[in-house]
Amino acid sequence: MEFTIKTATPEKVRTGVLVVGLFADGILPPAAHAVDKASKGKLAQLVKRGDLDEKAGAAVMLHDLAGIAAERVLVVSLGKSAEFSDKAYRDALNSVAKALASGVAKVAAVAIADAELDGRTLAWRLQQATRQIADGAYRFDAPKAGAKDAKKERGARKITLLIGDKVSDELEAAVRRGQAVAEGMALAKDLGNLPGNVCTPAYLADTAEALGKQFKFDVEVLERADMEKLGMGSLLSVAKGSHIPPKFIVMHYKGGKSKAKPVVLVGKGITFDTGGISLKPGAEMDEMKYDMCGAASVLGTFKAIARMALPLNVVGIVPATENMPGGNATRPGDVVTSMSGQTIEILNTDAEGRLILCDALTYAERFKPACVIDIATLTGACVVALGKIPSGLLANDDDLAAELLKRGTESGDRAWQLPLWDEYQDLLKSNFADMANIGGRYGGTITAACFLARFTKAYKWAHLDIAGTAWVSGDAKGATGRPVPLLAEFLVGRAAAKAD
C-alpha cells in the first residue's frame, strides 16, 4: 500500500473513493464542509435525516455525488464533537480501514485528519491514519491454496492523505513512521499466525538474519552448545523435552553514537507451549502457537525502527524454544542453575516463559543497557486481571514505567501498571533452591514479574505481559501485532530525546 500527502480541495480530487469525516451533531471539519458546499448540502442532509449513526465509526457510502469529482464519497461519523477523543478518532479510522480493505476502490483519497483533536497535532493524526489504514489491509492467507492470487485482488493500493495545510518534512516523516509501524505489526502478526510446525526456533532465527541482511544490522544466533557454555541451565531445562533445537537470537541495531548505551528488548520465544510435563488442557491448545508473540514483537519492532532509520542503539534478544513433554523433559521438582548462578526449583513446567527469560535478562547485562524491556505472553492471570485491552506493565524504575505508559497512550497501544512490591517475593520461597518458579494461586502476574526482577538488578527494567493483548480468539482469531506500536513509539521518543 502506497501513501502520499497532498494539499488539495477534496471536492476536486479525482479518485475511486473520497473519505471525509463529520460530527454527529452536524459540525463539519474543513474537508467535509467543502464537500457539503460543492454537493449543495448533501452531507448536512445525512445528519439531519438521521441517515448516519451517531456512533464514531458509523459510515455511509455515497455514489456519483453531484459536484464531486470522486466516484464515491465515504462519509464517516466522528461521534459527537464534544466527545471527540483519541478513541473516537481511532474508531473512525478503523471504519475507513475496513472499507478500503474491502476492495471498494484501488485508489482512495482520505481527508479525515483535518478534524481538530485536543492535544494532538496534525502530524500525530496523519501517523495514526497511515498506521491504521495500512494495518487494516493486513490479511494472513499464507497456508491457503491460491493465497498469492487472492492477495493481489484485494484492497486499495494507493492512498492520498488530503490536508489543507502545506506539506512539510514533519508531516511526511509522520506518514513514514505510520507505514513503518504497520510493517512491523504485519511481520509480528505473520510470525504469530504461522503454525508451530513452521514457525520454529530456527524459523525465528532465519527471520532475524533476513532482517539483518535487508537493513544491514548484525545478528548472532547462539546454538545449544553456546548456551551450555554460558551456563543457561534455566533456558535449556525448557528445551529438553523437544527434539527441535533451541536458538538464542541477538540483534544489534546501531543507529546511534558508538558509545551510546543501547535499549535492550527481550522477547519470549516459546514457539509452541504444551505446558511440558505439567500438560495444558487440550481445548484451545492450538493457540499456544502464539506463545512466541513477545519474540515476534521484538522482530517487528526491529523492522519498524530499521525502516525509520532511527538514530538509536537497540539490542534485541530472543530466547527461542518449544516447551514439550517427552522422556527427557524437565520434571516438576527438578532444580536447575540459571546463568546468574541462582538456582530454581521448577514446581510447574508450564511456568516456562520466566525460565527462558531469566537467562536472557542475565545475558543482557553485558550490553550495559540504558534500560531493558522484556515482552512476554507470560500469565493467564494478566488476562483475568486486566482483560484484553491493556498489556500488563511492571517495572523496577518508576520513570521508565511512566514513559511506557505515556507512549502507550500516544500510540493507542496501552498498558496498565501493576505493583512490584517486595512483599510478593516471599511467595517464591523454595525449600530446595534459591527460588521456586511459581508463587501460588494469587497475584500470578505480579509473582511472575517478581521472579524476573531477581535477574534485573543491574539495570532499569520493565516487563510487559501481553498474554491478553497479543492475539484474539473466536471468529477473528489472529495475532494483533501488539505491542509493536507501543515499543516503536517508545523508541522514537528515546531517539528524539537524544537529539534535543
Swiss-Prot record:
<dbReference type="GO" id="GO:0006508">
    <property type="term" value="P:proteolysis"/>
</dbReference>
<dbReference type="GO" id="GO:0005737">
    <property type="term" value="C:cytoplasm"/>
</dbReference>
<keyword id="KW-0963">Cytoplasm</keyword>
<keyword id="KW-0464">Manganese</keyword>
<feature type="active site">
    <location>
        <position position="280"/>
    </location>
</feature>
<dbReference type="Pfam" id="PF02789">
    <property type="entry name" value="Peptidase_M17_N"/>
</dbReference>
<dbReference type="InterPro" id="IPR043472">
    <property type="entry name" value="Macro_dom-like"/>
</dbReference>
<protein>
    <recommendedName>
        <fullName>Probable cytosol aminopeptidase</fullName>
        <ecNumber>3.4.11.1</ecNumber>
        <ecNumber>3.4.11.10</ecNumber>
    </recommendedName>
</protein>
<feature type="binding site">
    <location>
        <position position="273"/>
    </location>
    <ligand>
        <name>Mn(2+) 2</name>
    </ligand>
</feature>
<dbReference type="GO" id="GO:0070006">
    <property type="term" value="F:metalloaminopeptidase activity"/>
</dbReference>
<dbReference type="InterPro" id="IPR011356">
    <property type="entry name" value="Leucine_aapep/pepB"/>
</dbReference>
<feature type="binding site">
    <location>
        <position position="352"/>
    </location>
    <ligand>
        <name>Mn(2+) 2</name>
    </ligand>
</feature>
<keyword id="KW-0031">Aminopeptidase</keyword>
<feature type="binding site">
    <location>
        <position position="350"/>
    </location>
    <ligand>
        <name>Mn(2+) 1</name>
    </ligand>
</feature>
<comment type="function">
    <text>Presumably involved in the processing and regular turnover of intracellular proteins. Catalyzes the removal of unsubstituted N-terminal amino acids from various peptides.</text>
</comment>
<keyword id="KW-0479">Metal-binding</keyword>
<feature type="binding site">
    <location>
        <position position="352"/>
    </location>
    <ligand>
        <name>Mn(2+) 1</name>
    </ligand>
</feature>
<feature type="binding site">
    <location>
        <position position="273"/>
    </location>
    <ligand>
        <name>Mn(2+) 1</name>
    </ligand>
</feature>
<dbReference type="Pfam" id="PF00883">
    <property type="entry name" value="Peptidase_M17"/>
</dbReference>
<keyword id="KW-0645">Protease</keyword>
<keyword id="KW-0378">Hydrolase</keyword>
<dbReference type="GO" id="GO:0030145">
    <property type="term" value="F:manganese ion binding"/>
</dbReference>
<feature type="active site">
    <location>
        <position position="354"/>
    </location>
</feature>
<feature type="binding site">
    <location>
        <position position="268"/>
    </location>
    <ligand>
        <name>Mn(2+) 2</name>
    </ligand>
</feature>
<comment type="similarity">
    <text>Belongs to the peptidase M17 family.</text>
</comment>
<dbReference type="InterPro" id="IPR000819">
    <property type="entry name" value="Peptidase_M17_C"/>
</dbReference>
<feature type="binding site">
    <location>
        <position position="291"/>
    </location>
    <ligand>
        <name>Mn(2+) 2</name>
    </ligand>
</feature>
<dbReference type="InterPro" id="IPR023042">
    <property type="entry name" value="Peptidase_M17_leu_NH2_pept"/>
</dbReference>
<dbReference type="InterPro" id="IPR008283">
    <property type="entry name" value="Peptidase_M17_N"/>
</dbReference>
